[in-house]
């Protein structure tokens, strides 16, 4: 969650001049050592595949913006975003006409998205632990997930959409964003809402729901329910 806050701060402070894409779109492929954490900023559309193939990242963007874009792996973390300059960490305000990223790695443990972009994984993602952090108005979508532990954090107006099966899930929503995980079956679920956002979950054995504000928690299944609500929000069975 700390990383999410830092990314949001970076995204919104001390920007230099705006640079618009010239419409001449190019694609560049990068070869990296394996990574299991993804961090990206801005309006990019990121498509991810978990694969045993050699890790790679492909970026499609306006040619005049590519020199201002940083694509790197440090440790096990992939970072894609505007380059920062100087001690104050200034960055260009990039306005691409197209900004697409495709990436594959052998494992996935964390995804951080700040801005209006999107992250999607249409194929199976298997992992022991997965943390998803979304700040802004973007969207994260995983179509087939298998995990022991899952944490999903939404700050702002974004949407987190999940399908699959996990053992333990924890969801936190701050603002007007939504978590749509009623097709992600979980043995135990903890859901926390602060604001007007909503959670949709599937809990088998136990559900703990905490609400401050007007948001609601909707659930499928027949779990033992513990709830605390301050405001007009409620924990409701589908």
Model-derived features: where do they sit?
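Intrinsically disordered, low-complexity terminal regions
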Residues: 1-238
């Amino acid at each position: 969650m700390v990383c999410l806050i830092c990314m949001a701060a970076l995204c919104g402070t001390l920007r230099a001049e705006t640079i618009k894409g010239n419409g001449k779109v190019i694609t560049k492929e990068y070869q990296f050592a394996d990574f299991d954490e993804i961090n990206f900023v801005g309006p990019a559309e990121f498509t991810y595949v978990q694969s045993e193939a050699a890790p790679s990242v492909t970026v499609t963007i306006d040619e005049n913006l590519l020199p201002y874009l940083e694509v790197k792996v440090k440790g096990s973390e992939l970072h894609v975003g505007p380059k920062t300059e100087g001690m104050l960490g200034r960055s260009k305000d990039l306005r691409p006409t197209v900004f697409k990223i495709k990436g594959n790695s052998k494992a996935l443990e964390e995804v951080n998205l700040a801005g209006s972009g999107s992250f999607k994984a249409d194929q199976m993602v298997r992992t022991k632990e997965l943390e998803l952090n979304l700040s802004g108005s973007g969207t994260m979508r995983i179509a087939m997930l298998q995990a022991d532990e899952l944490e999903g954090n939404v700050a702002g107006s974004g949407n987190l959409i999940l399908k699959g099966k996990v053992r333990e899930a924890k969801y936190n929503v701050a603002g007007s964003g939504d978590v749509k995980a009623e097709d992600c079956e979980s043995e135990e679920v903890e859901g926390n809402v602060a604001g007007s956002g909503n959670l949709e979950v599937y809990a088998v054995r136990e559900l703990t729901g905490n609400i401050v504000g007007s948001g609601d928690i909707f659930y499928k299944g027949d779990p033992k329910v513990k709830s605390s609500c301050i405001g007009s929000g409620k924990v409701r069975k589908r």
